[in-house]
């Protein structure tokens, strides 16, 4: 990686220093305000522990939810500070605001190895506007900056980009470094054949990724609701399945581009249909050319699963972004679960590099209990997509060069 990393800073450079660390603690909470999945908090632990062990004073900046620039009591970081304290086995104090006298007093009074969490940076509208004055006030807490928030690295915000103008050095944390190594590596210098599995309900949200992957992949497998836009573009009847009518031409162009580039583009040959969008719907398997009027496709079929598994078995690097069907309904989760199991097996027994690129695929892999078996699980939804699209991430671009 061409960016300066935290690993290049040892105790002599960190001891007694106040280090502002941007983390991604945007975790899901239930109605009682309890954290239901602490993956993102755990992902930042190696960076935080490294700083503690090297006697730095750790000041964490994070956002939570979308408070739209106002204080929202339900979006305070209180449960996150509590969970982080449990994981670290030490008290993590929370400020009342991320900037201002109270927060500065707390950061100035830290001892070596202490950890302080600044209250939600998005309580200020200046955060998302990348306001330089606000960034300067955030930077006033610290001597140097670490960005470990891959999930927010595609945003040019005050806490991801603006602060780097005031803090030197500004370096990548261990999580950010690992994300770039796997995702950038898979795109720039993969072990081939390279396959991408792209799922999800809408072509529109994956256009950039599909277009970019066609320049880089040997095979692309498409699943999820977006397949019906491709079928409709081919002139097939798709019943009541989800279709983006304004993207038919685009679907045709993508298939055409794949042919021109010699990329093997695989779409399902059979699907699981439902008579309504419900976990208890009646279901049946159908070939794609015989989908009947009142039915809708909610998963890929058994024949397609086998074809996809055989295609993936020939690959050395696989990137997966987006589910194969409505995996939230058990009846329509078979396609997604089969792909997850296939990747876990290829990773474990055939040394295939498997990268789960953010969003719903991660949820599916976690739900199946297979996360540990994958080479890399990305913590960033939008950031993963933008990186796979070949875009520059502002939060990464702003860091010091190695």
Swiss-Prot record:
Family annotation (Pfam families): PGK (PF00162)
Keyword list, A-Z: ATP-binding, Cytoplasm, Glycolysis, Kinase, Nucleotide-binding, Transferase
UniProt subcellular location: Cytoplasm
SUPFAM superfamilies: Phosphoglycerate kinase
Main location: cytoplasm
Reactions performed catalytically: (2R)-3-phosphoglycerate + ATP = (2R)-3-phospho-glyceroyl phosphate + ADP
Record keyword DNA-binding present: no
Enzyme Commission code(s) on record: 2.7.2.3
Any one GO cellular component localisation term in the record: cytosol
Pathway: Carbohydrate degradation; glycolysis; pyruvate from D-glyceraldehyde 3-phosphate: step 2/5
Enzyme class, spelled out: transferase
Binding site for ATP: 206, 297, 328, 358-361
One Gene Ontology biological process: glycolytic process
Binding site for substrate: 24-26, 40, 63-66, 122, 155
GO molecular function, one term: ATP binding
Organism superkingdom: Bacteria
Record has Coiled coil as a keyword: no
Family the entry assigns: Belongs to the phosphoglycerate kinase family.
Assembly information from the UniProt record: Monomer.
Protein name per the record: Phosphoglycerate kinase
Species this protein is from: Prochlorococcus marinus (strain MIT 9515)
